[in-house]
């Protein structure tokens, strides 16, 4: 199956790229510059494409992104510290982000005669990101079936949608994903902060998976406090 992977450069999507390269026919990676403050993640996506020997496209949608106001990822709003399940983490939502990116990715896939678009949404995203939940994935596939009817048949491959980030770490280790060559931190500094929701989830995932975390965090122990009182199980 010829597959294009939507790759941000983060742990999840880079692990997915390595999985697809091992199990399917990976024909390229596509990334999106939407004006995110952690744009450095795109460098890690480019490195992944080079490592796997496939083309890499960075689609500039900053003109769209600047209109999706109110998010800590694109606006002058502080990125909150803590666990993803906390109410404050809603500040990291970029409205309709995945729907916009996937619509473009499906267009690319149809033009390139690909069979599938792969996306690394996972169970840990369900807390606050509605466009990462199973209902969205199913509905998007149905919509694309109509949008491309008679022209192309492209499947949405989301193998992690019902699994935890710890499961992704386990799967990534199996496919020899170089975790040190991935970027998660929403703050986009020189090092992973260790305090934002995605850093906390990343650190916890390695712990739960029993896999050594090679990440250099500014605050490597904050995750313990942040995760106390929260279950790693997903909100379905």
Curated annotation (Swiss-Prot):
Similarity comment text for this entry: Belongs to the QueC family.
One Gene Ontology MF term: ligase activity, forming carbon-nitrogen bonds
Organism: Rhizobium rhizogenes (strain K84 / ATCC BAA-868)
Domain of life, source organism: Bacteria
Role description: Catalyzes the ATP-dependent conversion of 7-carboxy-7-deazaguanine (CDG) to 7-cyano-7-deazaguanine (preQ(0)).
Names of the cofactor(s): Zn(2+)
Record-listed ATP binding positions: 7-17
Full protein name: 7-cyano-7-deazaguanine synthase
CDD domains found in the cross-reference section: QueC-like
């Amino acid at each position: 199956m010829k597959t294009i992977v939507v790759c941000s450069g983060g742990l999840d999507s880079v692990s997915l790229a390595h999985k697809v390269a091992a199990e399917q026919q990976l024909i390229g990676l596509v990334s999106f510059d939407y004006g995110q403050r952690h744009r450095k993640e795109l460098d890690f996506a480019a490195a992944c494409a080079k490592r796997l020997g496939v083309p890499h496209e960075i689609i500039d949608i900053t003109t769209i992104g600047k209109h999706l106001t109110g998010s800590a990822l694109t606006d002058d709003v502080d990125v909150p510290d803590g666990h993803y399940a906390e109410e404050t983490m809603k500040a990291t939502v970029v409205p309709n982000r995945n729907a916009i990116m996937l619509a473009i990715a499906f267009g690319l896939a149809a033009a390139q005669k690909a069979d599938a678009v792969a996306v690394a949404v996972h169970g840990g995203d369900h807390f606050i990101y509605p466009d990462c939940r199973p209902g969205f994935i199913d509905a998007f596939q149905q919509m694309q079936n109509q949008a491309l009817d008679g022209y192309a048949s492209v499947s949405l491959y989301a193998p992690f949608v019902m699994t935890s980030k710890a499961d992704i770490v386990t799967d990534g280790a199996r496919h020899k994903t170089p975790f040190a060559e991935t970027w998660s931190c929403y703050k986009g500094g020189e090092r992973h902060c260790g305090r934002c929701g995605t850093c906390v989830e990343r650190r916890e995932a390695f712990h739960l998976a029993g896999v050594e975390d090679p990440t250099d965090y500014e605050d490597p122990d904050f995750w313990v406090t942040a995760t106390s009182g929260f279950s790693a199980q997903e909100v379905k």
